[in-house]
């Protein structure tokens, strides 16, 4: 279950859920117009990680214990690879918050923890869950985040209960766009840049307006950014969402996140969980099931969530499937950059007619073109869309 959630339909810990970790964005993957020197987070934190230099508020443990009624079970709203998350209400301000109590096994030292808090406190974007504060008290390590009353995308898409209103098509595209913008910030605008590493539907939180906010980014020590590739000592992502090259070799790049985004977009299109052993054998892995359909564009409508009851523009469905198919390509080099995905989804979410006025890059990582030049978003039929993949 994701962190910082509102009431969830399923609070039990999920199998195969790895720690939600972030890693540095390799220098070789910086945008062509931004080959700036980047440093490790540890270097960024040097001489700055003292509490007085951290923008996030420092809380006493007793304050957070009071806010959560001593971390009672009824206040528990989520569990993940890093610990438990409780809903709380600050006694002094009345602010409702989400308190993440980190697992005390393998605790970092005080300095390492403060370096990470300093790093997290520098990340600000409308599509990231805000870090309000932290607690470093004895062996206790806690993070305080804004509370997200609607829970996670998973709650509204994959754990729909009887009588619950399913997400409509426009909301799904809007959520996809918000999540993509959050990733774009981490990849291309944060300094130093960050790879999410465990992007999934349970880590996409929703506020009262159904705006997407990413959670659980950057909660682990980061490796060297000088290497040509970031090779993790162990793969820690969630099965089904991990890019194949990361799962096989531990090699991590921004394109690993793009693959994971493609999985979530496919979940948004289909309403199906990426791994579900209750489905027929050939459908248990969502990506494996969808790949043959990607090759037969006339079958694209088969991917649509039955709960949508056909209430979606066919052209928009075709475009969304095209984006997902590109993100889910086996070879990382031919996947798009997340900024190209943002361009495409922005166009989809605002389209009112002819797309000829759109400027920017199209979804083609090998030979960037304008949307007008490549034309893939202008296609009317599934076959036309797929011919441009």
From Swiss-Prot:
Its main location: membrane. Residues 1-36 are annotated as: Disordered. The modification Phosphotyrosine is found at residue 246. Pfam families: Pkinase. It is a lipid-anchor. InterPro entries: Kinase-like_dom_sf (IPR011009), Prot_kinase_dom (IPR000719), Protein_kinase_ATP_BS (IPR017441), Ser/Thr_kinase_AS (IPR008271). Belongs to the protein kinase superfamily. Ser/Thr protein kinase family. CDD domains: STKc_IRAK. The modification Phosphothreonine is found at residue 238. Residues 71-348 form the Protein kinase domain. Its EC number is 2.7.11.1. Keywords: ATP-binding, Cell membrane, Kinase, Lipoprotein, Membrane, Nucleotide-binding, Palmitate, Phosphoprotein, Plant defense, Serine/threonine-protein kinase, Transferase. GO terms for biological process: defense response. Coiled coil: none annotated. GO terms for cellular component: plasma membrane. This is Probable serine/threonine-protein kinase PBL24. May be involved in plant defense signaling. The gene is PBL24. It is found in: Cell membrane. It comes from Arabidopsis thaliana (Mouse-ear cress). It is an enzyme of class 2 (transferase). The modification Phosphoserine is found at residues 202, 232. The active site is at 198 (proton acceptor). It catalyses: L-seryl-[protein] + ATP = O-phospho-L-seryl-[protein] + ADP + H(+); L-threonyl-[protein] + ATP = O-phospho-L-threonyl-[protein] + ADP + H(+). ATP binds at residues 77-85, 100.
């Amino acid at each position: 279950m994701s962190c910082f959630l509102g009431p969830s339909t399923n609070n039990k810990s999920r199998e195969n859920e790895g720690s939600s970790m972030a890693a540095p964005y390799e220098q070789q993957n910086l945008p062509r117009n931004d080959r700036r020197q980047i440093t490790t987070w540890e270097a960024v934190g040097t001489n700055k990680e003292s509490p007085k230099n951290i923008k996030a508020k420092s809380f006493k443990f007793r304050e957070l214990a009071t806010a959560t009624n001593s971390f009672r079970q009824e206040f528990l709203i989520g569990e993940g690879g890093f610990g438990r998350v409780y809903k709380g209400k600050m006694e002094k301000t009345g602010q409702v918050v989400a308190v993440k109590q980190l697992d005390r096994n393998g605790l970092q030292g005080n300095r390492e923890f403060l370096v990470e808090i300093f790093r997290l406190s520098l990340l600000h974007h409308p599509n990231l869950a805000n870090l309000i504060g932290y607690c470093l008290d004895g062996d206790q390590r806690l993070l305080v985040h804004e509370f997200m009353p609607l829970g996670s995308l998973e709650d509204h898409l994959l754990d729909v209960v009887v009588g619950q209103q399913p997400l409509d098509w426009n909301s799904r595209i809007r959520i996809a766009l918000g999540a993509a913008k959050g990733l774009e910030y981490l990849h291309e605008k944060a300094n130093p840049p960050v790879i999410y590493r465990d992007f999934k539907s349970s880590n996409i939180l929703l506020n009262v307006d159904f705006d997407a906010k990413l959670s659980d980014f950057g909660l682990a020590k980061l490796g060297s950014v000088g290497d040509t590739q970031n090779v993790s000592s162990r793969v820690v992502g969630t099965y089904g969402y991990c890019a194949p090259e990361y799962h096989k070799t531990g090699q991590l790049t921004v394109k690993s996140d793009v693959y994971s985004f493609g999985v979530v977009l496919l979940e948004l299109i289909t309403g199906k969980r990426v791994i579900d052993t209750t489905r027929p054998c050939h459908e248990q892995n969502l990506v494996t099931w969808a790949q043959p359909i990607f090759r037969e564009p006339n079958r694209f409508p088969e991917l649509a969530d039955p709960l949508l009851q056909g209430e979606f523009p066919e052209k928009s469905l075709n475009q969304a499937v095209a984006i997902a198919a590109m993100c889910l390509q086996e070879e990382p080099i031919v996947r798009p950059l997340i900024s190209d995905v943002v361009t495409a989804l922005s166009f989809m979410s605002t389209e009112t007619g002819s797309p000829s006025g759109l400027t920017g890059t199209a979804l083609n990582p090998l030979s960037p073109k304008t949307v007008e030049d490549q034309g893939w978003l202008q296609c009317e039929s599934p076959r036309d869309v797929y011919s441009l993949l």
